[in-house]
């Protein structure tokens, strides 16, 4: 019997759900990554690109805390939730061992999301490593609205590019690799599309050095930019304070955000107030 309950949290924007989801498939897409497809007997809750899930890892004494994982994709027709998992520790390795038919307890959806694209807006989605995960869902949602997304994906080598064929289904996909084995050689900020085309907004997720470089580029070009931070998280609700990040109280320091007070900077919980932030608020 599926256990379903509503969770009231500090984040009032969307209701949170505690669900026992059924594993539909686990696909090894890379030596360090698996794609977990989950389903439920009832329609999955509303989720927006950029939000994440806290999953409970059962059967492992060293994984008391839940693991935060970005929402990779939501297939409404098949009623599936996709999670792209990097196997970096005991907890995520345990998740990679799940089999079809197993149950995974999930708290979702958590955090905020990327700014929804508007008609006529040209949006560039830049990702690296497992940070490409939330951008797939973002691109799919844009396509559903008749807006063509542009993806710029970076990796060390061609074999490290994740889900590239699926990204190509939802928009234009450009690639950089550090060794030049696929796409243009170098980092995402070196790609020629940044010089050849003009974008209204950039959404990015991936390694912090990459996102900082993207933020610098956006500032130089006067492009709106938001980044999804990957701080260590535990509760996902803003209670444990382990994901705190110091940010500016406002974007321009002249019109303070009324939600905060007490100076030019403030501490926020990435899990509750983020993970997506306007880069002008970040102390980068």
Where does each model-flagged region fall?
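Ferredoxin-reductase
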Residues: 15-100
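Local cysteine-cluster metal-coordination motifs and their immediate loop/turn environment
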Residues: 208, 230-249, 264-275
């Amino acid at each position: 019997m599926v256990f379903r309950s509503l969770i009231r949290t500090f984040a009032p924007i969307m209701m949170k759900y505690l669900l026992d989801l059924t594993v539909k498939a686990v696909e090894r897409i890379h030596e360090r990554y698996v794609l977990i497809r989950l389903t439920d007997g009832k329609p999955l809750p509303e989720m927006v690109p950029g939000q994440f899930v806290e999953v409970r890892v059962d059967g492992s004494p060293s994984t008391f805390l839940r693991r935060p994982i970005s929402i990779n994709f939501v297939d409404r027709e098949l009623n599936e939730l996709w999670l792209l998992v990097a196997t970096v520790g005991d907890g995520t390795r345990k998740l990679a061992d799940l089999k079809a038919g197993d149950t995974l307890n999930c708290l979702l959806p958590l955090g905020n999301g990327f700014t929804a694209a508007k008609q006529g807006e040209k949006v560039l989605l830049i990702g690296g490593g497992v940070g490409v995960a939330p951008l797939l869902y973002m691109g799919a949602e844009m396509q559903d609205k008749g807006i063509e997304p542009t993806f710029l994906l970076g990796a060390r080598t061609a074999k490290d590019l994740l889900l590239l064929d699926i990204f190509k289904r939802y928009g234009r996909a450009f690639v950089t690799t550090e060794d030049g084995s696929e796409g243009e050689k170098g980092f995402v900020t070196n790609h020629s599309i940044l010089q050849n085309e003009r974008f209204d907004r950039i959404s990015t997720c991936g390694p912090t050095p990459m996102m900082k470089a993207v933020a610098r580029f956006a500032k130089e070009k006067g492009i709106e930019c938001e980044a999804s931070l990957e701080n260590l998280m535990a509760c996902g609700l803003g209670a444990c304070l382990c994901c705190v990040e110091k940010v500016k109280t406002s974007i321009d320091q002249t019109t303070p955000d009324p939600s905060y007070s007490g100076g030019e900077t403030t501490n926020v919980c990435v899990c509750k107030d983020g993970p997506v932030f306007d880069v002008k608020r970040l102390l980068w």
